[in-house]
């Protein structure tokens, strides 16, 4: 049985300025996204479906900047609304206290979508092409975020059989019982595995929106599965149908991804050509 090392959340102290590990993992996440995005620019399946205007590194940097804003603002608001609405409605100024923790992936996803809608319109880029470009680059950032959760010893898993070789005691939980290291499970499922699947899937020409759909389904399934090993939020517990809030929020992602993939498969592309395998009707 393992014991979490209880790492100091402050990685570096520069006078009055404390640099936290979690902040560094966010920087790592954005750096990995930028690296992945620049690699994506070199892939023929992406270049071959470019819309008006050529993509450049400046586009990637601006897109990342807006994405960061979407992640932070959407992630914070999502946590406040999805997980502690009563508290934050009674204490609205606490919403601004981001340094106290509390972010939601599902809220961050909505924030990113809104920011990229604005980016697509101002740069005359096809929205779904943009989202398909982003999707394979997201999981590595998610993996970095889960690494930050593990370093902080937060979001630990449910009780595990002590005989499980990787069962771990998290001193921060205060229980002293061995638990699943669910942060690592999520790092592997939502991060590494999902990245590999999406990267390989996106290497071939796909209809617009299908890579985005694959991300929604893939993340939703990975998160839904990992939630069975993650300790539910203490103030929420297990909800209806014995599911956690994370699972309930993942269901719309899975269903939305399936519907989006079907829609992309059956609709004519933006150039007016029918989907593969169909001929235009006689007029």
Task: Label each PLM-derived region with a short phrase.
Residues 1-283:
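Hydrophobic, membrane-interfacing alpha helices
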């Amino acid at each position: 049985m393992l014991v979490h090392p209880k790492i100091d959340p402050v990685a570096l102290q520069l006078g009055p300025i404390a640099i936290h590990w979690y902040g560094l993992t966010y920087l790592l996440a954005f750096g990995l996204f930028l690296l992945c995005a620049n690699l994506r620019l070199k892939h023929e399946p992406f270049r071959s479906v470019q819309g008006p205007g050529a993509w450049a590194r400046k586009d990637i940097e601006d897109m990342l900047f807006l994405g960061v804003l979407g992640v932070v603002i959407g992630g914070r608001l999502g946590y406040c609304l999805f997980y502690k609405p009563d508290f934050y409605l009674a204490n609205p100024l606490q919403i601004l206290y981001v340094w106290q923790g509390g972010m939601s992936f599902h809220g961050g996803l909505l924030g990113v979508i809104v920011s990229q809608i604005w980016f697509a319109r101002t740069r005359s880029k096809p929205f779904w092409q943009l989202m398909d470009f982003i999707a394979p680059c997201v999981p590595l950032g998610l993996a970095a975020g889960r690494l930050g959760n593990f370093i902080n010893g937060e979001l630990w898993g449910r009780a595990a059989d002590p005989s499980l070789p990787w069962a771990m005691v998290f001193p921060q939980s205060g229980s002293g019982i061995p638990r699943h290291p669910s942060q690592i499970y999520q790092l592997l499922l939502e991060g590494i595995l999902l990245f590999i699947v999406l990267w390989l899937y996106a290497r071939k020409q796909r209809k617009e929106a299908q890579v985005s759909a694959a991300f929604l389904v893939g993340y939703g399934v990975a998160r839904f599965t990992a939630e069975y090993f993650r300790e539910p939020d203490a103030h929420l517990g297990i909800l209806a149908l014995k599911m956690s809030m994370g699972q309930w929020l993942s269901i719309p992602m899975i269903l939305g991804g399936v519907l989006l993939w079907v829609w992309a498969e059956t609709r004519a592309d933006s150039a007016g050509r029918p989907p593969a395998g169909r001929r235009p009707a006689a007029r």
